[in-house]
Swiss-Prot record:
Residues 31-92 form the Chitin-binding type R&R domain. One of its GO terms (molecular function) is structural constituent of chitin-based larval cuticle. This is Larval cuticle protein 9. It comes from Drosophila melanogaster (Fruit fly). One of its GO terms (cellular component) is extracellular region. Residues 1-16 form the signal peptide. Keywords: Cuticle, Signal. The keyword Signal applies.
Length: 92
């Protein structure tokens, strides 16, 4: 469920700017793990990896980055597991 929420948030950011083109897109989905990365022409980028652990718990880590309205780059590095979503926001 947490993965779905994080993915929905990232997709909302992606589709908020319909003028952006996909510059890079990679993904690999397996039964027990996954990873993906994308970069858009408007300087939004994201990377995420995840693995299925015991008792149907996913452990996910990743980061995304975008340019805020004030012109500064914002980067969020996060993990998500059975204890919740743990982001760390860095503004460059």
């Amino acid at each position: 469920m947490k993965f779905v929420i994080v993915l929905a948030c990232l997709l909302a950011v992606v589709f908020a700017n319909e003028e952006a083109d996909v510059v890079k897109s990679d993904s690999e989905v397996n039964l027990l793990d996954f990873n993906y990365a994308y970069e858009l022409s408007n300087h939004i980028r994201a990377v995420q990896t995840g693995a299925l652990k015991e008792h149907d718990n996913w452990v996910v880590s990743g980061e995304y980055e975008y340019v805020a309205p004030n012109g500064k780059t914002v980067k969020v590095v996060y993990t998500a597991d059975e204890t919740g979503y743990h982001p760390k926001v860095v503004e460059a």
